[in-house]
A protein has these predicted regions:
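Residue(s) in the substrate-gating loop at a strand-loop-helix junction
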Residues: 126
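"…together with the soluble PPM/PP2C metallo-phosphatase catalytic core" -> "…together
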Residues: 129
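Thiamine diphosphate
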Residues: 2-121, 253-445, 450-451, 460, ...
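Short hydrophobic segments within beta-strands
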Residues: 123, 152, 312, 361, ...
Length: 596
């Protein structure tokens, strides 16, 4: 260690001496200077919120946290989430309100799965305290006694365009945190000595997460800019920035830096690579089983193959059959209750640094609530798996609120997200195993309606590989489906064969990536005629995907059958027919196209 370095970190049982405190103050000012220089070179600027938290960041990174700077992926490192809208290493938090949920996932993994010493810190801005997802995370952390988690509120009073509703009424933040069962401290966010003491005390608290409410000021240390409302998003003129930098530099008393203490190396060695199906499928042809039940059985089976497989649920486990996993692996089942945004964030946190294989389950329709969390998870390139049950009209006994008819459009729009849509129990089991082995975000769309097993146990499946489930040399048209509509297509094929009309039926299996080669080659073999039939609105679903895939191919025409209006409650077969996607409507479409 050089003369200009000193050891920081919570390895010390006593508080910092005055020299260490001064180094921390100086490092906070250096952070301000770097923030000024970085933001001044941009056409937009988030300078003022960067400056308000400088002391917090100085103490956190150079006194409190334990980590190896040269090994940022080390599983024993403490974790930090900057939920003020700033990205940090593994989790891009995007719009404020998402970071604490991801921090909860990391803390849960550390406490219950890794049973390790690392701690998790999350810096939040006061403006994001108006986001409901923050308080979903507060409730989760309190319920699960995440005493290895600390949330730090940077209460600088000013939001994007105006003052916050409670401004600097620190006691309001304190009461809110305490009401959720958190150990809470109120501090002056500029006082490094108090920050050091409080951060150290929090490490000794057991059974509760800790919240630190820090009163700060935007643009701290900048004359005529500090605590004003007119500077958010504005770049500072170079001359003014240079003058402020000189002023701050004059306050720096030492050139020393602090080196963080190394982590306690007690995280277990794990392996989440190459998970295989331990035993063959037990299903036989024509067994009747819903794909969502098959998915629950597959998850439980997968849990026996690797002890890092976890399942998160939003109080729907008795509907989506994740309760099967819960019964067989209760220590790896996380009940998130009806808080879908937080469930997705927790799953993202659990999956960071490849510590778990996470599956988050709820009604497919309810994932629309968490779309922002999903898109930000894709930006972070974190591998999680989402299972959406009760898709489409298969849940038509319920009301339209439960019917997911937009979910394919949502998940197809997420970069690099793999979208599975299995049609029977065997393909569902393969989808679960393929998702577990994927390094991308995956969505598995499952149905409530019982459908027949159509594949044998010897069938193999691959991501991006469709299946031609019915064909002959005399086929005049292709019908492409998935899920319940594939079975409607097979019924239609049987009926049409009685009239000597042969059609080819394709099961897409994955909607994204799409098996373009199979679609085009079979279309060319059947006169360039394609019908897509889907239990989804026409926008963004199977029809749109197929149309895009063949758009550059001459002499191929696609006819789309989809749910064209808001559905009504009823039996599944009635709802399919009412919406124009039943076997009867497929037969009519085939005849109409062939006549023309």
């Amino acid at each position: 260690m050089s003369e200009a370095e000193a050891s920081g970190g919570m390895a010390h049982n006593t508080g910092p001496d005055e020299k260490t405190l001064q180094v921390l103050r100086d490092m906070a000012n250096r952070l301000r200077i770097r923030s000024i220089r970085a933001t001044s070179s941009s056409t937009t600027s988030h300078l003022t919120p960067c400056s308000s938290a400088a002391e917090i960041m100085s103490v956190l990174f150079f006194y409190t946290m334990r980590y190896k700077q040269e090994d940022p992926e080390n599983p024993d490192n403490d974790r930090c989430i900057l939920s003020k809208g700033l990205p940090f290493v593994k989790v891009a938090t995007g719009w404020p309100g998402q970071g604490l949920g991801a921090a909860c996932g990391m803390a849960y993994t550390g406490k219950y799965f890794d049973q390790a010493s690392y701690r998790v810190f999350c810096l939040l801005g006061d403006e994001e305290s108006t986001e409901g997802s923050v308080w979903e995370a507060f409730a989760f952390a309190s319920y699960y006694n995440l005493d290895n988690l600390m949330a730090i509120f940077d209460v600088n009073r000013i939001g994007h365009s105006s003052s916050m509703s409670v401004e600097h009424c620190i006691d309001i933040y304190q009461k809110r945190c305490e009401a959720f069962g958190w150990n809470t401290y109120v501090v002056d966010g500029r006082d490094v000595e108090t920050l050091c003491r409080v951060f150290s005390q929090a490490a000794q608290v057991r059974g509760k997460p800790t919240a630190v409410v820090a009163k700060t000021f935007k643009a701290r240390g900048m004359p005529n800019v500090e605590d004003t409302e007119s500077w958010y998003g504005r770049p500072m003129p170079k001359e003014r920035a240079d003058a402020i930098v000189k002023l701050i530099e004059s306050q720096i008393q030492t050139n020393k830096i602090l080196v963080p203490s190394p982590p306690i190396e007690d995280s277990p060695q794990i392996n989440i690579m190459a998970i295989y199906m331990g035993s063959p499928s037990v299903y036989i042809a024509d067994d009747m089983l819903s794909t969502q039940r098959a998915c629950g059985l597959a998850l439980a089976k997968l849990g026996h193959e690797n002890d890092r497989v976890i399942v998160l649920d939003s109080d729907t486990n008795n509907c989506n059959f994740s309760d099967i996993f819960k019964k067989e692996h209760p220590e790896r089942f996380i009940q998130c209750y009806i808080a879908e945004q937080n469930m997705v964030n927790v799953a993202l946190g659990c999956a960071t640094r490849d510590r778990t294989i996470a599956f988050a389950c709820t009604f497919a329709a309810f994932f629309t609530r968490a779309f922002d969390q999903l898109r930000v998870g894709a930006i972070s390139q974190i591998s999680i798996n989402l299972i959406g049950c009760h898709c489409g009209l298969s849940t038509s006994d319920d009301n339209p609120y439960h019917m997911a008819l937009e979910d394919l459009a949502m998940f197809r729009a997420i970069p690099n997200c793999i979208v599975f849509y299995p049609s029977d129990a065997i393909s569902t089991e393969h989808a679960v195993y393929l998702a577990a082995n994927s390094k991308e975000m995956c969505f598995i769309r499952t149905s409530q309606a019982e459908t027949a097993v159509i594949y044998t146990t010897k069938e193999t499946f691959q991501i991006g590989q469709a299946k031609v489930v019915r064909q002959s040399d005399n086929d005049k048209i292709i019908v492409i489906g998935a899920g319940v509509t594939l079975h409607e297509a097979l019924v239609a094929a049987d009926e049409l064969s009685k009239e000597d009309i042969s059609i080819r039926v394709i099961d897409l299996f994955t909607i994204k990536p799409l098996d373009i080669a199979t679609i085009i080659s079979n279309a060319k073999a059947t006169g360039g005629r394609i019908i897509t039939v889907e239990c989804h609105y026409p926008e963004g679903g199977i029809g749109g995907a197929v149309c895009a895939a063949v758009s550059m191919e001459p002499n191929i025409v696609v006819h789309q059958l989809a749910v064209m209006h808001v559905p009504q409650s009823g039996r599944c077969n009635e709802a399919l027919d009412f919406s124009g996607i039943s076997s009867r409507h497929i037969i009519m479409a085939v005849k109409c196209i062939l006549m023309n």
